[in-house]
Design a protein with these regions (language model features):
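Surface-exposed cleft-lining segments at the edges of enzyme active sites
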Residues: 81-82, 107-123, 158-163
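Active-site-proximal beta-strand elements of phosphoester/diester hydrolases
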Residues: 1-9, 98-110, 142
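Active-site beta-strand/loop signature of hydrolases that rely on acidic residues for catalysis
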Residues: 7, 23-41, 101, 130-151, ...
Length: 250
């Protein structure tokens, strides 16, 4: 089974920059998207062979997630079921026969860490939500988690200490999530691989220099870790400031 996740930084814009071509070529069973920045009714494109599920933010042109699945899920839910967290279209959960898939676009703490306090509350609620699901079936979590977990996960870690995405608080919450029963699929297979990033600033020729961050993940319930066949970073795929990430399960 092949699964793909991509923060497209605006799906309509990405459609003009190779999204459909990549989607067709990779032929994923499930394709998850973050930061759609659109409402479903604005879509002037179709993805034949895929069921579509959208969760858009109340605020137009902001945030949003979507799941495209070849197999129709047993059930699909939107959000965490907590009003204060469910206005920005950040979570879609699809239940399948053997597992849950959770597609997430984690809130960015923002420049000046304006949303760090909210982010901490979000992290606790999201972790609790995943653990409830995990009691029922194994869980696959994908998306832009907006945190580089370890120093190896970003190029310039020294100068980014305490910047959004690499604060001690955000990293500690990621550690809490993993410790609670989840495996970072990429580090499971490639624990010491350097230069593996999924997001690059549009400034300072960051992508050209590979001065990036690994903030997009596939996490797997620990009891399914031995089913991880590969965890992929498609760094050569442009179209967004993020690149797609993939998970192949046995």
């Amino acid at each position: 089974m092949k699964l793909i996740s991509w923060n497209v930084n605006g799906l309509r814009a990405c459609m003009n920059k190779g999204f459909k071509e990549f989607m067709d070529s990779v032929d994923a069973d499930i394709f998850c998207v973050q930061e759609t920045k659109m409402q479903r009714e604005q879509a002037e494109f179709v993805f034949p062979g895929y069921e579509e599920y959208w969760n858009s933010a109340e605020k137009k042109g902001y945030s949003g997630t979507a799941v495209f699945s070849k197999v129709k899920p047993l059930n699909v839910t939107y959000g965490l079921g907590i009003d204060e967290h469910d206005k920005e279209g950040r979570v879609i959960t699809a239940e399948y026969q053997d597992f849950y898939l959770v597609n997430v676009y984690t809130p960015n703490s923002q420049r000046g860490l304006e949303r760090l306090d909210y982010r901490q509350v979000w992290e606790d609620a999201f972790r609790a939500y995943l653990l409830e699901l995990d009691q029922l079936k194994p869980v696959l979590v994908c998306g832009d988690l907006n945190v580089a977990h370890r120093e190896i996960d970003l190029k310039n870690w020294k100068t980014n200490r305490n910047n959004a995405g690499f604060t001690d608080e955000e990293r500690a919450k990621m550690t809490e999530l993993l410790t609670a029963g989840f495996t970072d699929s990429f580090r499971y297979l490639y624990p010491e691989k350097e230069g593996a990033y999924t997001w690059w600033s549009y400034m300072f020729k960051a992508r050209e220099k590979n001065a990036g961050w690994r903030i997009d993940y596939w996490l797997v319930s620990n009891r399914w870790a031995d089913r991880i066949e590969d965890s992929l970073i498609y760094a050569d795929i442009t179209g967004s400031d993020h690149c797609p990430v993939g998970l192949v399960l046995k």
